[in-house]
């Protein structure tokens, strides 16, 4: 099983868009990817998730992020299910879906719960260097919230770019709104620097260990 901060395992996979190599396929394009597993094709909760993901796919792509699905179904099942979604729900699925019919990648990533033969609803966010940045699991009986996954991706990218941390429900936090948290001071000198920055109006603080600022 892999964990956050590790390199995504190099693997060749069969998808609805042909055979691709992960994570290189996206890394070579300078893109992040969101790999998400679903328990099975032609099931109600999974259908709502695919419909909702396609509705938001442009928002992911605007961030330089590509979605890619996965289940232990065969590729022809994926294709037929995607046809059904287009014909009955009016959404053409434009992202690839992995046919992991032997469950090898799902097993390697820890997507299959103990005693089960199908995947849970796992989400792996992988950056453009092939590093796993976040992992989220939902049980089969509860569908995911893609808006929260979008928020998570945005927060990771802002954190990388600005060197800050992001609070609960950012950018709609109850305490500091859309502001970002400055990394806590770890030395006496850094405490003084925080106090000086606060005096200059560069940051705001509840205390020296809890400072925040407006993102520019």
Swiss-Prot record:
Q: Which domain of life is it from?
A: Archaea
The compartments listed are: Cytoplasm
Please report which protein family the annotation says this sequence is part of: Belongs to the peroxiredoxin family. Prx6 subfamily.
The entry marks the following residues as binding substrate, namely 121
Q: Which HAMAP family match?
A: Peroxiredoxin
Which residues of this protein are catalytic?
A: 46 (cysteine sulfenic acid (-soh) intermediate)
Q: One GO cellular component from the entry?
A: cytosol
Sorted alphabetically, which Pfam families does this protein's record hold?
Answer: 1-cysPrx_C (PF10417), AhpC-TSA (PF00578)
- In Gene Ontology terms, what is one molecular function of this protein? thioredoxin-dependent peroxiredoxin activity
Q: Which GO terms describe its biological process?
A: cell redox homeostasis
The catalytic activity of this protein is classed by the Enzyme Commission as: 1.11.1.24
Q: How does it assemble?
A: Homodecamer. Pentamer of dimers that assemble into a ring structure.
**Other information:** The active site is a conserved redox-active cysteine residue, the peroxidatic cysteine (C(P)), which makes the nucleophilic attack on the peroxide substrate. The peroxide oxidizes the C(P)-SH to cysteine sulfenic acid (C(P)-SOH), which then reacts with another cysteine residue, the resolving cysteine (C(R)), to form a disulfide bridge. The disulfide is subsequently reduced by an appropriate electron donor to complete the catalytic cycle.
Cystine links in this protein are 205-211
* Swiss-Prot/TrEMBL keywords: Antioxidant, Cytoplasm, Disulfide bond, Oxidoreductase, Peroxidase, Redox-active center
Q: What does this protein do?
A: Thiol-specific peroxidase that catalyzes the reduction of hydrogen peroxide and organic hydroperoxides to water and alcohols, respectively. Plays a role in cell protection against oxidative stress by detoxifying peroxides.
The name of this protein is Peroxiredoxin
The Thioredoxin domain extends over: 2-158
Catalysed reaction(s) here are: a hydroperoxide + [thioredoxin]-dithiol = an alcohol + [thioredoxin]-disulfide + H2O
Query: What CDD domains does the database record attribute to this sequence?
Result: PRX_1cys
